[in-house]
């Protein structure tokens, strides 16, 4: 990281990170676009790599558990639990937990709601259980669309909050919790309720929609390297809101 920072200082002539302004946004856009073009020149197979790997992983999983690809409904359940159990987990652990949760659903027609039923995931266990409770509540409610349709539907954050308030009042508890990471007029998918990274990003990518960006730890490391703060923690929520 220090070597990269030294290269960054030499290339930019700066010692302080880029400030957040329109001029620097343009500079960073050009910088990252140039990196992407170099990567594509070195390996043109990078185009569509993620899509190919996701599809290949599902093909392998269908050998382990054939019911996953048995119907659009069963695939949607697996995609949901794969996204939810990715939270802070290694890839192998993620797929193992997702398979366990899929089989739990096949046996019981619902996902687990207590630590007695599901105690994996470490410190992310509570967040996973909250997502499972949401899945169960929505699936059991008499909505005019399937859960997978809701998760792929477009909303503004304001509209999604209104839907959540109405839904939660109908079922008597806060099954849907809309994150505050985006402004009220920002367009998101219903899956945003699972979180900006897990729901708006990774879940959509698993489902084949690659327009949303999954800003995981690797993306953040790239971004911090580009702006010149590889050793500094990211902005807190207050600073993020000030910049919207």
Predicted regions: what they are:
Residues 1-244:
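HhH-family (HhH-GPD) DNA N-glycosylase catalytic core used in base-excision repair
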